[in-house]
């Protein structure tokens, strides 16, 4: 079986275990997957995605522009480079996407930041308030070559520390940008 297909099937089985509950507006689904590992042994991160909203924070408190930060990194099929994506928007205007290639050491640095802030301890956490707009909360989705993964989601509040976002913004070379800085 293809490795990518195996990852997709594993994620689907995992998400099927944690997506339960009411789907009407205002309905709240809170779940913590008991089978999700709360630590990751592997150091070989192969894909990473973070969506972090700072719309509920004051810019003075975060030292970041208020907005939604979407940061992604994925190891290329040949394993020679990492494809990175940065998309920042202010919740009203749509941001533009910046894509670039990085060295494979880039994913190791992302993994170090994830371990520093113990993101794996939130693995399997899912909190969804139906009817809220898409631009609130935090989502993390990370996959490792060993088959281990981290997935956590909350569309109501930012449950991970703002310092995590600051360090990732530094690594992804995001400099307090808004869509207007991208020429939008």
Across the structure, where does each feature detected by a protein language model lie?
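Short, well-ordered, aromatic-rich surface patches in folded extracellular/luminal domains
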Residues: 3-66, 96-184
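Short, solvent-exposed coil/turn segments at beta-strand boundaries
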Residues: 74-81, 145-146
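Acidic/histidine-rich, surface-exposed loop or edge segments in extracytoplasmic proteins
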Residues: 82-97
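Short, surface-exposed charged micro-motifs
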Residues: 70-74, 139
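Generic structural motif
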Residues: 48-50, 80-84
């Amino acid at each position: 079986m293809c490795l990518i297909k195996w990852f997709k099937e594993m994620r689907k089985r995992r998400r099927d275990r944690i997506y339960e509950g009411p789907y009407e507006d205002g309905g709240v689904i809170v779940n913590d997957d008991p089978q999700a590992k709360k630590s990751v042994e592997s150091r070989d991160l192969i894909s990473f995605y973070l969506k972090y909203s700072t719309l509920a924070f004051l810019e003075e408190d975060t030292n970041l522009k208020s907005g939604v930060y979407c940061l992604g990194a994925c190891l290329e099929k040949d394993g020679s480079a990492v494809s990175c994506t940065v998309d920042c928007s202010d919740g009203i205007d749509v941001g533009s996407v910046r894509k670039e290639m990085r060295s494979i050491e880039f994913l190791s640095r992302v993994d170090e930041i994830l371990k520093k802030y113990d993101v794996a301890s939130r693995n399997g956490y899912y909190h969804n308030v139906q009817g809220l707009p898409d631009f609130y909360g935090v989502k993390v989705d990370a996959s490792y070559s060993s088959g281990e993964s981290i997935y956590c989601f909350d569309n109501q509040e930012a449950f991970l520390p703002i310092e995590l976002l600051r360090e990732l913004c530094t690594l992804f070379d995001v400099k307090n940008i808004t869509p207007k800085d991208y020429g939008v």
